[in-house]
Amino acid sequence: MKQIIVNLKTKKYDIVISQSENDFFTALAKAAKTNMFFVITDKNVEKLHLKYFTVLLKRKGFNVKTAVISAGEIGKNIKSLSFLYDKALEAGIDRKSCAIALGGGVIGDVAGFFAATYMRGINYIQVPTTLLAMTDSSVGGKTAVNIKGGKNIAGVFYQPDLVWINSAFLSTLTERHIKNGLAEIIKYAFTFDKKFYSYLSDTLENGTVPPKDFEYIIYQSCSYKARVVEKDEKEITGLRAVLNFGHTFAHALETATKYKKFLHGEAVAVGMLFAVKLSLKLRICKPETYKEVENLLQKADFTLSTKNNARQMLSLMKKDKKSIDGNIKFILIKDIGKAVSTYVKDNVVLNVLKNFTGENK
């Protein structure tokens, strides 16, 4: 078992990385003082893991209610929230109950938002089942849903009471979904740690890492994120914004393609390359740094090009949460392991966008 304690000003909670059910129940006894659990999942995870997980809880004598929403970004909306509120009320979920997010990043976001707002807030636990959720979205308390105009526009910061990461869940993922999680892992290397970059560069094989290394990269990724969240829980100082490297472009790309073409990590991979092109244009980084970023993303076998309209992408990026008064803030990198945040003028962004999307060819 590996354990990380996230120590915030208002609370602290454990990230438990273990395949042991006993380790989970030991942590659960400390985190949730209730007999009633409301397990929220999606239609894909329902088929794979819901029965196992509910039986696991019921064997310990817990009262378990469940709710299932649509899988993927199409289920990450206010309609799903409304469904969960009604379902919880019908099931007798009260303020002392505990919600459990069983699934990937979308489920973590929706279930967290539900927990933050149902009866003005109930406890919740993250049980991520994807590599992306295990290494990024389950930690840190960001919860949100999408609206028509953009991704993650409606949301709150609401910390979980426990994160249980069981890497055995990864055995049911496709290669594409493993790679989807690798993008966020690579992000930590680009923004925080050159040694981790070297490790990934040496370890990546055929677009993935050996399963024996999963727990190590999960632990490393969660450690990076936990330390940042402790220092800047709600993105007040700007330190936590570094975790959004590649995301300004990625969220615009996902919105432009109506969440149908790219998984989140795939969009982030393209977004990271765009951010480094922007860094190069502004002379924030050297050509060698750009090449290092490109090489690792290629080793992970990501598609790194897109043909979306440059002006549409610019318009969508101006709606990003980091933008102020229409000025787009980007996370850029000076070198591997060194990130900076800065506002970039529209004409510069548009010029790089046109080159990046092939409009200038």
Curated annotation (Swiss-Prot):
NCBIfam families: aroB (TIGR01357). Catalyzes the conversion of 3-deoxy-D-arabino-heptulosonate 7-phosphate (DAHP) to dehydroquinate (DHQ). Binds 1 divalent metal cation per subunit. Can use either Co(2+) or Zn(2+). Its cofactor is Co(2+); Zn(2+); NAD(+). Gene3D superfamilies: 3.40.50.1970, Dehydroquinate synthase-like - alpha domain. This is 3-dehydroquinate synthase. Its EC number is 4.2.3.4. GO terms for molecular function: 3-dehydroquinate synthase activity; metal ion binding; nucleotide binding. GO terms for biological process: amino acid biosynthetic process; aromatic amino acid family biosynthetic process; chorismate biosynthetic process. It is an enzyme of class 4 (lyase). It is found in: Cytoplasm. Pfam families: DHQ_synthase, DHQS_C. GO terms for cellular component: cytoplasm. SUPFAM superfamilies: Dehydroquinate synthase-like. The gene is aroB. The keyword Metal-binding applies. It comes from Endomicrobium trichonymphae. Its main location: cytoplasm. The lineage of its organism: Bacteria, Pseudomonadati, Elusimicrobiota, Endomicrobiia, Endomicrobiales. Zn(2+) binds at E184, H247, H264. It catalyses: 7-phospho-2-dehydro-3-deoxy-D-arabino-heptonate = 3-dehydroquinate + phosphate. The keyword Metal-binding applies. Belongs to the sugar phosphate cyclases superfamily. Dehydroquinate synthase family. Coiled coil: none annotated.
